[in-house]
Amino acid sequence: MGLRIGELCGLTWADIDIENRVLYVHRTVQRICTCNSDGKKTKIIISVPKSDTSFREIAIPEFLAEYFMAFKGDDNYYVLSGSEKIVEPRAYQYRYKRVLSESNSGDHTYHGLRHTFATNCIQNGFDVKTLSMILGHKTVNITLNRYVHPDYVHERKLMNKLAMLF
């Protein structure tokens, strides 16, 4: 669904309205530096999303609503942990990398999934404005210039469509 890792970590079951198939993004989890006299330290905070457009409602596809229904926990539980305990972004990134390594799937970041999601959405007919809203971007330019990556196979299909015109 193209969520940022901090948004995913901050997601509680109360943020998922299964009946109306809507996911609400209104918090993020992040690790911040608390540099003090003891040295460089960090702490986990729960805060508001990155920008005003990051507060959003995302329609949930039916197959995902069914999945959520099967695993739904208490409203105050975090989706990733299944409890009131947060899974912090760095820990989730480490888990993701470990799964990729164990499955010989290469070395990718969680954020790369956001790019893949955006590219797949465009290749499957999403309009850029809707995708930009789903991703929580301020402008469609951010979506197009940073998140949507050309694909040779998709380009070939489009070029072959031109042949039908002649």
Regions found by a protein language model. Name each.
Residues 1-9, 22-23, 119-120:
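Short pre-functional
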Residues 9, 25, 33-37, 69, ...:
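Extended hydrophobic-aromatic, low-complexity segments
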Residues 10-16, 132-138, 146-148:
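A short, basic/aromatic helix-end/turn motif that makes direct DNA contacts
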Residues 10-70:
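Conserved tyrosine-mediated DNA breakage-rejoining catalytic core shared by Y-recombinases
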Residues 35-39, 145, 149-166:
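DNA/chromatin major-groove-contacting recognition/catalytic segments
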Residues 63, 67, 91-98:
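Generic alpha-helical secondary structure signal
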Residues 1, 58, 73-86, 93-137, ...:
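Short, basic (Lys/Arg/His-rich) helix/loop patches that form interaction surfaces
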